[in-house]
């Protein structure tokens, strides 16, 4: 999935192939280890064949898909992307996974912009626990003024 820039979490892969989460997680780790080993061998042998390029997984990777599933308008989807880029650039929440941060961003924006999107709704489309969404949201709240442009705060009466 990552090679073709269709990034999916291990949980999503488990759902697609009707696997348990543990098996999918182990499978993803094993696949990554195998790809890395093949690339290492190619470099060691100075082969000119193409190294497998894995696209980086960031919160931005998941924003568009999650916002689409939640019917979030383009303006607020762009705001979520803007926040994801700032978080990544400034390494603001390094302890959470990219898809958890994406879920937290969407909830954060939904609260600021008065959308009727609950943690449970985000959980249903992303499989991120409500506790994790809440923890990410609290971390984002600490950086609200640097993450949300003043014009958006004004527009949504914050």
Predicted regions and their residues:
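Short, structured motif recognition centered on aromatic/hydrophobic residues
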Residues: 1, 100-109
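A cyclin-like helical interaction fold
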Residues: 1-95, 99, 120-124, 134-158
């Amino acid at each position: 999935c990552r090679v073709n820039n269709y990034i999916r979490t291990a949980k999503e892969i488990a759902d697609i192939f009707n696997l348990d989460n543990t098996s999918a997680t182990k499978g993803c780790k094993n696949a990554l280890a195998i790809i890395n080993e093949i690339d290492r061998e190619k470099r060691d042998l100075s082969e000119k064949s193409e190294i497998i390029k894995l696209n980086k997984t960031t919160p931005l990777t998941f924003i568009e898909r999650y916002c689409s599933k939640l019917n979030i308008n383009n303006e607020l989807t762009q705001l979520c992307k803007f926040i994801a880029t700032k978080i990544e650039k400034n390494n603001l929440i390094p302890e959470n996974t990219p898809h958890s941060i994406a879920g937290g961003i969407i909830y954060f924006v939904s609260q600021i912009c008065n959308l009727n999107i609950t943690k449970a709704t985000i959980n249903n489309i992303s499989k991120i626990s409500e506790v994790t969404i809440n923890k990410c949201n609290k971390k984002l709240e600490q950086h609200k003024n640097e993450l949300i442009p003043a014009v958006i705060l004004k527009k949504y009466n914050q």
